[in-house]
């Protein structure tokens, strides 16, 4: 393989990675807690897009529970977004884990 072919392959891979990055930005995953009482929507770049809180879990006397549920939902969405990114990037990275 000559240098020109290597450059073409690198450019093609760069275009494919850009396409995957755009797809990740447009793909939404949901993390939930409390049986769906809290829903966090996050894109494939792990940017929170929205948080929905059911009024039933808003208790001014138990703010700790609400905070715990939010953490669970955010972490759930983050794990799903990470898994999505790994799945989408896997064909381009040859299965190397932990890059994205």
UniProtKB/Swiss-Prot annotation:
Coiled-coil intervals in this record?
A: none
Q: Name one GO molecular function term.
A: DNA binding
Which coarse location class describes where this protein primarily resides?
Answer: cytoplasm
State the signal peptide span.
none
What InterPro entries is this protein classified in? YbaB-like_sf (IPR036894), YbaB/EbfC (IPR004401)
- Record Pfam families: YbaB_DNA_bd
UniProt KW Cytoplasm keyword: yes
Please provide, in alphabetical order, the Gene Ontology terms of the cellular component aspect for this entry: bacterial nucleoid; cytosol
Keyword Coiled coil found: no
Q: Can you say where in the cell this protein is located?
A: Cytoplasm, Nucleoid
* Keyword terms: Cytoplasm, DNA-binding
User: Which proteins does it associate with, and in what oligomeric form?
Assistant: Homodimer.
Question: What exactly does this protein do?
Answer: Binds to DNA and alters its conformation. May be involved in regulation of gene expression, nucleoid organization and DNA protection.
What family does this belong to? Answer: Belongs to the YbaB/EbfC family.
The name of this protein is: Nucleoid-associated protein Cagg_3200
């Amino acid at each position: 393989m000559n240098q020109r072919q290597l450059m073409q392959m690198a450019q093609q891979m760069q275009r494919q990675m850009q396409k995957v990055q755009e797809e990740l930005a447009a793909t939404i995953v949901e993390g939930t807690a409390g049986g769906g009482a809290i829903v966090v929507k996050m894109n494939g770049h792990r940017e929170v897009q929205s948080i929905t809180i059911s009024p039933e879990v808003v208790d001014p006397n138990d703010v700790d529970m609400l905070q715990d549920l939010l953490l669970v939902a955010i972490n759930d969405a983050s794990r799903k977004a990470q898994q999505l990114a790994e799945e989408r990037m896997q064909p381009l990275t040859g299965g190397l884990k932990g890059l994205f």
